[in-house]
Amino acid sequence: PEGREGSISTVPGSYGAWIQTPEDELEMARQLGAVAAEFARIEADFGRRLHLGLEPEPDCFLETTAQTLAFFQGSLEQGAVPEIRRILRCSQEQALFFLRRHVGVCFDTCHVALQYENPAEALQSYRNAGVLISKIQISAALRSPASKEGLEALSAFREPVYLHQVKGLGSDQRIHSWPDLPEALSEIPATAGIQELRIHFHVPLFVSPASPLTSTADTLDDSFWREVRNGACSHLEIETYTFDVLPKEVHPGDIIESIVSEYAWVLGKI
């Protein structure tokens, strides 16, 4: 609508293992530059601002806040700015302006929690670096101790529809990674020193899974909501999409009532 912005979330460049060379990074950046140029044309012609948000995700090219900031301050500018200049016939300064106005980050709180990052601090890092927060996706990951009881409880969440990357925090504070839940369940008993597991399985924000499982909804603390209220981003999206694959032990029941409950939870925080 007139007077509003449009945010579009997208993959963070690529699945991580597919990017092998600096040229691969520059090719992604050039493509993003072409998007920024097209969005600049749309805004000039129709007065409607659109922006694209790259969504860091476990095992993807961009996983962590630090990796994302490095890309935005390095390869993205190197590849995208010349492409914008070529398409729009504009100056270096104008091209950089269009890039920063139309390409940013989709901040998924489930994904941030999986990296054992503090959501409020991550938001502040992007804002301090001048990176646009295109959209905040409010979501929670599944959390479990790396105990026999925890692994048994997690077995109910094995399903073939979605990829459920797993991150484990070691006693040495090192983060261990598994590409999907079945691999994690088979390998963790042989991996010493894992204290906690976080699983890329979106669970409803208002639901507390049965012990010993919990969720990362508690990482969305007062400092995070203060950043939201202070204007970190105007687009918030509740992103629980797993109702069709949730085990019955944690499924909240009626879908419509569940969506209502999620809105009530978020609005209560705001």
Regions found by a protein language model. Name each.
Residues 12-17, 56-60, 109-113, 140-144, ...:
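Active-site-proximal loop/turn and secondary-structure-junction residues that shape catalytic pockets
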Residues 6-8, 136, 236:
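Hydrophobic residues within beta-strands of alpha/beta enzymes
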Residues 1-104, 114:
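Active-site acidic/histidine proton-transfer and metal-coordination neighborhood
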Residues 68-72, 79, 92-231, 249:
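Active-site capping/gating regions of soluble enzymes
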